[in-house]
Structure formats: structure tokens, C-alpha cells
Design a protein with these regions (language model features):
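PLD/PLD-like phosphodiesterase catalytic module centered on the HKD motif
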Residues: 1-344
Length: 344
């Protein structure tokens, strides 16, 4: 679905309450002119005076290079810092995390902090609102998982004292973030900071009694694939789906049917590939940048959505050892059709 993230950030109830004091963005690429002109004023009106952007070193260098003439407020109204590389992988996760004493708003998905990522591309985001009077277990788990990741990143790397001060302010202001959250069977937030997403998926299926059960169907929406389809093959060989459907925008995808077919396992049907485009007249050339993996089981369906493409650096590797840093939401439903709307 088409949402404008700017409108979610400035959604009335929160801005009127002025309930926020801090915001953290994780992004791969960024456009600081877009941020200063469009996003920063909205954050200020919501009460966010403590704003931190954590980005990939390449994205950081590119943003400074392209924006050096217009960028006016970096280091004053907000801090932008690159997450140091620990190996060959890039910082690829994408979130907006807004918090205050009794407020929380979290967007976790596929869009970078750019005009394209927040308004123009087709992206997918999970959206969570913390309500102190009635916080759902899913919401508490989402916020605590992301907050733990942010603290790991800032604790394990050499960041300027300014950044550490910003993290301490959040810890002091939003003490509700430290509530204990319980692990859930039907919902999780996974990063590959110290364990691969593939490992977490296979462990989760085992824990809920699905290990060894063949999938009815596997549906994938991802622009990027390994050249030889290694990660797609891993899903096929380990989850035994009766059918695999791949949805992509042919002009914006690295899916190479010939090279993937060359190493495709015998006895498993090759994926059915669907070329898709935005169906609305006003977006004929829209870049489809979202990422989804939907598994249809005997009794229900699960969906993994977020920043991870169908590649080994995203799903099979750990950030500390060569993977891209990714962040995804897992949801499980007893309804096999629960996630059909995402691919319609």
C-alpha cells in the first residue's frame, strides 16, 4: 500500500501532545537536503530535539558530497554518524524510532532516508505505536528489540561522545523502553547483528513444531538476488515448497533466470516469475524497492518483511562476519491468506 511516511511522522495526535523528545534513524543511503527541508521541521514540531541519524559509511560520504552546499544544520539540530564497518557488509537496516516519556512511534521497513525511500518508491514498512495505557505485547517487543539493537551498535563501536550522550538521554527520558518484553510465537523482530536471519527462521520453525514440514508455497518480493540464486536455493532445498513464486520489476532486478537455473536443485520446480508494476496511473515508472518473504504452511502463513533482499549477505550471513546489517519483522497468522494483500 502507498503511504507517505512524512504524514505518519507528523500524525496529529502525537504532534499535538508534543509527546516526543528523541528520534533515531537507521538508513543505508540518505539525502540530508530532503531530511533538513521535509523531515526535520516535522520532528521539531513533534518535540524531538534529540535527533540521531546512523548510516552506512558509503551513504554518509555520498550524502556529504552531494549535499555539502545546501546542508545547514548537521551537528546543530541533529547528529549524523556512520556506523563503522566491521567487515565487508553494509549497514542496510532502515528504521525511524521516535520516543518520549510516554510515547513511541516505530517504522521498520525497506525505505532509506531519502525522498524516494519515504515518498516515491514502493516500500514496505511495519508501523508500531506505543500506548502507555494499553501496550500490546507485539508493540513492546518491537520497541525493546530495536532499542537493544541500537544500544549494541552504539556500545560496540567507537562513536563520538555526542552520540553516546544522545543514547543516554533516550535511556533517561523513555524509561518504558526498559520494560521486560516476552518472546512471542507469532511475532518477532530479527536483526543479523550476531545471528543470521536464516538461523533465526529455521530455529523459530523448529520451536513452533514446523521443522521438516514442507511449505505449501513460498512467495518472494525482492529486487536483489545472488548471481547464482544461492539464498533462493537455500530456501527451496530446506523448506521444500510445493510452489515458489517470485515477484519482481524486471527492469530493476538482479534476478538472472539462466544463471539461477544452472545450479537449481533437481526435483524442485523452478520458481514461477511474475513481472509486476505499480498499477496506478500516476506511478507508471515507480521503483519497486520493498522486500517480502511469505511462507504458506499447512495451517497458516508467515511473513518476513523489512530491509533484507533474497541474498546471502542479507539472510545467511552475520553482520560481524561479512553480512549486511539487516532488520526484519516476522509475523505468523493462522489464516493462509493473511498476507495475500501485500502481493496483490
Amino acid at each position: 500500500t502507498m503511504i507517505n511516511l512524512k504524514t505518519i511522522i507528523e500524525e496529529d495526535s502525537a504532534v499535538k501532545r508534543g509527546g516526543y523528545s528523541s528520534a533515531i534513524f537507521l538508513t543505508y543511503t540518505l539525502n540530508l537536503n530532503f531530511f533538513e527541508q521535509i523531515i526535520a521541521p516535522v520532528l521539531e514540531s513533534a518535540g524531538c530535539s534529540n535527533v540521531l541519524i546512523l548510516t552506512d559509511p558509503d551513504g554518509y560520504a555520498e550524502a556529504l558530497e552531494t549535499g555539502k552546499k545546501q546542508v545547514a544544520y548537521a551537528g546543530m539540530r541533529y547528529v549524523c554518524a556512520p556506523i563503522p564497518r566491521v567487515s565487508s557488509g553494509v549497514q542496510h537496516s532502515k528504521i525511524l524510532f521516535m520516543v518520549g516519556k510516554e510515547s513511541g512511534r516505530l517504522l521498520l521497513g525497506s525505505g532509506n532516508l531519502t525522498l524516494n525511500g519515504y515518498s516515491l518508491n514502493l516500500e514496505n514498512f511495519s508501523h508500531y505505536e506505543y500506548n502507555p495505557n494499553d501496550p500490546s505485547q507485539e508493540t513492546l517487543l518491537a520497541f525493546s528489540s530495536v532499542w537493544k539493537l541500537i544500544q549494541k551498535i552504539t556500545n560496540d563501536n567507537q562513536f563520538p561522545e555526542t552520540v553516546q550522550r544522545q543514547i543516554r538521554k533516550i535511556r533517561d527520558d523513555a524509561q518504558w523502553l526498559n520494560q521486560n518484553s516476552i518472546q512471542l510465537e507469532n511475532f518477532a523482530i530479527w536483526s543479523n547483528y550476531d545471528q543470521s536471519i536464516w538461523t533465526q527462521l529455521t530455529k523459530w520453525r523448529k520451536d513452533i513444531g514446523l521443522a521438516g514440514n514442507p511449505l505449501k508455497e513460498l512467495r518472494i518480493f525482492s529486487p536483489y538476488y545472488d548471481k547464482d540464486g544461492a539464498m533462493l536455493r537455500r530456501f527451496a532445498e530446506n523448506l521444500f515448497p510445493d510452489r515458489i513464486e517470485v515477484y519482481l520489476s524486471p527492469e530493476n532486478s538482479t534476478f538472472n533466470a539462466n544463471s539461477i537455473q544452472a545450479s537449481w536443485p533437481e526435483g524442485i520446480d523452478f520458481p514461477s516469475v511474475f513481472g509486476i508494476h505499480d498499477s496506478r496511473e500516476e506511478h507508471p515508472n515507480r521503483y519497486l524497492h520493498g522486500k517480502l518473504i511469505v511462507g504458506i504452511e499447512d495451517k497458516g502463513a508467515w511473513c518476513i518483511s523489512g530491509s533484507a533482499n533474497m541474498t546471502r549477505p542479507a539472510l545467511d550471513q552475520v553482520w560481524q562476519r561479512g553480512g549486511n546489517l539487516e532488520l526484519v519483522t516476522l509475523q505468523l497468522s493462522s489464516d493462509k491468506k493473511a498476507f495475500d494483500y501485500l502481493l496483490e
